Regions:
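Class I S-adenosyl-L-methionine-dependent methyltransferase catalytic core
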Residues: 1-164
Length: 164
């Protein structure tokens, strides 16, 4: 597993942070990537968010349920990092651990064997072995001062029989 730590200024648009943009440029292979929480600036071909600039404007879990299994080259998983951020969207279920687990189960179902899940947040949990994924890379992006690091994990779907 490759573990890196880099420093960069924080930005509300995760994918514009230089070390993260570089990671995505290296890791995104194929032309069928999905981003259920895209916001702005997502490199995925299929984007969804509650903001108007996304291709689709649906609840992320409902959006993920629409895809066929074992098809996507990869999924970018960059949900709101905290309950406070999640509540800004006004959806009560965003503060439920079950909601996030259900999203991860759908992501595991959608990604094809050998495909990637690239997750962003304040922890390194990713999708995990119990969903058939093996972590290959961790990028810690330090922002200094009182700002939490952004943690990026790259996982490969190595066992398609364990999707949840």
């Amino acid at each position: 597993m490759k573990i890196e730590r880099k420093w960069a200024m924080p930005n509300k648009w995760t994918f514009t942070i230089k070390p993260i943009a570089e990671l995505l440029k290296e890791e995104i292979v194929g032309d069928y990537w999905i981003d259920p929480f895209s916001g702005n600036n997502s490199p995925a071909q299929i984007t969804n968010d509650l903001v108007e600039k996304a291709m689709f404007n649906k609840d992320a879990l409902d959006f993920l349920k629409e895809f066929e299994g074992n098809r996507a080259d990869g999924i970018l998983y960059d949900p709101p990092y905290s309950i406070t951020q999640a509540r800004q969207y006004g959806k009560k279920e965003f503060s439920s651990m079950k909601y996030w687990a259900d999203c991860k189960n759908e992501i595991a179902r959608i990604i094809k064997p050998g495909g990637k899940a690239i997750c962003f947040g304040w922890n390194s949990m990713g999708l995990g072995k119990n969903r058939g994924f093996e972590m290959t890379r961790i990028l810690l992006v330090a922002h200094g001062g009182s700002k939490n690091d952004t943690i990026c994990t790259v996982e490969i779907k190595s066992n398609p029989n364990l999707t949840h």
